[in-house]
Amino acid sequence: KQKNVAPILLYAKGNTDLLNQKSVAIIGSRTPTIEGEKAATYFSKEFASNGFNIVSGLALGCDALAHQSALKANGATTAILAHGLDVSIYPKENKDLAKSIVENNGLLISEYGFGTPCTSYQLVERDRLQSGMSTATVLIQSKINGGSMHAVNFALYNQRLLYAVNYKANLVDVSVIQENIHLLEGRN
């Protein structure tokens, strides 16, 4: 069963005004195809350029591309962390990106107190916040049962707008966009 529970407390580092800005969650595979990378970059830049705060989970792949693209567009971005703010950034490959987000008027937030390390359960809970604090969620690319499906399911459960990128079948291996196809065909 999905949870529709707002966090009791949020820990924040950076521009907390972004919590009141219209936001779009950009989510997807940690290993997107070239077409997935292009889509993540395009949609993040477009939304950021039009005044939306880009929300994602600072994971490798689509999440990192979403944050980077928002910054390149001089837009706003919020990274939701699955650990305390004082703990080493997960994944460690995105430590510099997290620093850049804060330095460029962005925001890092977590519902976990200081000293709390990242766990797989908390990664799922992070996905709940991504869809929960966003007007809409955009699925860039996901296999069936990919990690992005947590955010998709939370968006559906909480009746948020949900979009999936539609790819030309000859450009992308169908196995890496199966969840996109399901959503586009009207899965509910």
Model-assigned labels for residue ranges:
Residues 1-188:
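Glycine-biased, small-residue-rich flexible motifs in mid-sequence functional cores and linkers
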